[in-house]
A protein has these predicted regions:
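Helix-breaking motifs and short loop linkers at transmembrane-helix boundaries and internal kinks
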Residues: 49, 81, 102-108, 247, ...
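Conserved MFS/SLC helix-loop-helix module at the cytosolic interface between two early adjacent transmembrane helices
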Residues: 68-106
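Helix-to-loop junctions at the C-terminal end of transmembrane segments
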Residues: 69-81, 267-279, 368
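Paired small-residue
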Residues: 96, 107-116, 306-314
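Helix-loop-helix hairpin linking two adjacent transmembrane segments in secondary transporters
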Residues: 106-108, 137-194, 237-241, 249
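Cytoplasmic helix-loop-helix junction between adjacent transmembrane helices
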Residues: 112-150
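Intracellular juxtamembrane helix-capping segments at the cytosolic ends
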Residues: 123-135, 321-337
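A late C-terminal transmembrane helix in Major Facilitator Superfamily
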Residues: 339-370
Length: 402
């Protein structure tokens, strides 16, 4: 992906470029489009004359598109100017959101969400690379965390707001509003994002595709995937865990989700600062150890409501810190082993987290059936331990001790 022109952007010692915050706004719009479906499943299913289970395919279709689009389409678009790719993905989001609002049947909705998911994967990959290229290396982690903050805010605040709007108006109006937000974000990027001038900076399409299968990048992506497996083998079933095992009521459950969302925002920013202030590998190892202990805490303290609130908060903090740290690790490895493929590396991170989320949900379901609901916390902790072992193995292989 060509980003040579970003060298022309003044790099202030204190403030991040405005384009970083616009990228965050755009990632918020994409995140809202992805996550809002979970809060709108019932009215969508009713309006489209489908079952809730069938309507749940709207979530899977989007995630599948993002997982494919992030590494593969990003590699295929490696030679295109960054601003052009970003604007094209925002146009897809705007048009796709309007198409969702007007969808006459579930099949049409699923198809549109898959296409928008493809654009989502490309946008987050290219935006992640662009953010780190717009600032000095010493602030790359913070810039990346601001871009990803948009997704975190969409999950923590945008989804409850959108669910409420869907209840008082209609789910179609919510998607139409996302389309307007996408247009505003794209218009801002049109003026704030510098135009590319040197196409030779980016790797060729073939070289970018080869980067996807580079062993160092695959190992780092494996760590990222295990982070998601550890988190979502538990978090996917957090509602029955808290309601049935901890004795919390709906009010406490809402408070727990609020703690998760609020701390997730802090975790996103913390991950960026840790990536800038110390080696990302060492910070990731410490965060993984804390994640494993956090999940063990859910198992051991499940009868303590206040402990559950605190642990929900630290789960959000640690997971989103690891999202930023893992992406920075992949970007750093790409610079060492396949220069010019940074955006593809960011896409590989996105695909890994999406795959890990799906695998984590499946693992949790298997554990519940085979052992019981409490076991999901133990399963998550073991996945965190596996991530630590894989990270340690990679550090030894690269002769870069933690």
């Amino acid at each position: 992906m060509s980003l040579a022109s970003t060298s022309a952007v003044p790099r202030a010692a204190t403030a991040l470029p405005p384009a970083i915050y616009l990228l965050s706004l755009c990632s918020f719009a994409f995140g809202l489009c992805e996550f809002i479906a979970a809060g709108l499943l019932s009215p969508m299913a009713r309006d489209l004359h489908a079952s809730v289970a069938a309507a749940g395919g709207a979530i899977a279709a989007y995630a599948l598109g993002a997982a494919i689009g992030a590494p593969v389409l990003t590699a295929m678009l490696a030679r295109r100017p960054t601003r052009q790719v970003l604007l094209a993905t925002m146009a897809v989001l705007a048009a796709g959101s309007v198409a969702m609002a007007a969808a006459p049947a579930l099949g049409a909705l699923l198809g549109v969400r898959f296409v928008v998911g493809l654009a989502h994967g490309v946008f987050m990959a290219v935006a992640s690379h662009a953010a780190t290229s717009l600032v000095d290396p010493s602030r790359a982690g913070r810039a990346l965390s601001i871009v990803w903050l948009g997704l975190t805010l969409a999950l923590a605040g945008g989804v409850p707001l959108g669910t409420w709007l869907g209840a008082v108006s209609s789910w179609r109006a919510v998607f139409a509003a996302i389309g307007v937000l996408a247009l505003c974000g794209g218009a801002g990027l049109r003026f704030a994002m510098p135009a590319a001038r040197q196409e030779a900076v980016a790797a060729s399409t073939l070289a970018s595709l080869r980067a996807i299968v580079q062993p160092p990048l695959l190992l780092a992506a494996g760590v990222a995937a295990l982070v998601s497996v550890a988190t979502f083998s538990f978090f996917t079933y957090i509602s029955p865990f808290l309601l049935q095992l901890s004795g919390l009521d709906a009010g406490w459950l809402g408070a727990a989700m609020l703690c998760f969302g609020a701390c997730a925002i802090g975790g996103n920013l913390l991950g960026g600062h840790c990536a800038d202030g110390a080696r990302a590998d060492r910070s990731a190892m410490l965060a993984l150890a804390a994640l494993g202990l956090n999940l063990l805490g859910f198992y051991m303290l499940r009868a303590q409501p206040l402990a559950m609130l605190a642990l929900c908060g630290t789960l959000g903090l640690l997971f989103f810190a690891l999202v930023t740290l893992s992406t920075m690790r992949l970007l750093g490895l790409a610079q060492q082993h396949c220069p010019g493929s940074d955006a593809v590396a960011a896409g590989l991170s996105i695909a890994a987290f999406n795959a890990g989320t799906a695998a984590g949900g499946a693992l949790g379901g298997v554990l519940i059936v085979a052992i019981g609901l409490p076991s999901i916390a133990i399963g998550g902790a073991l996945a965190a331990l596996l991530a630590m072992l894989l990270l340690w193995f990679q550090s030894q292989k690269l002769d870069a001790p933690l």
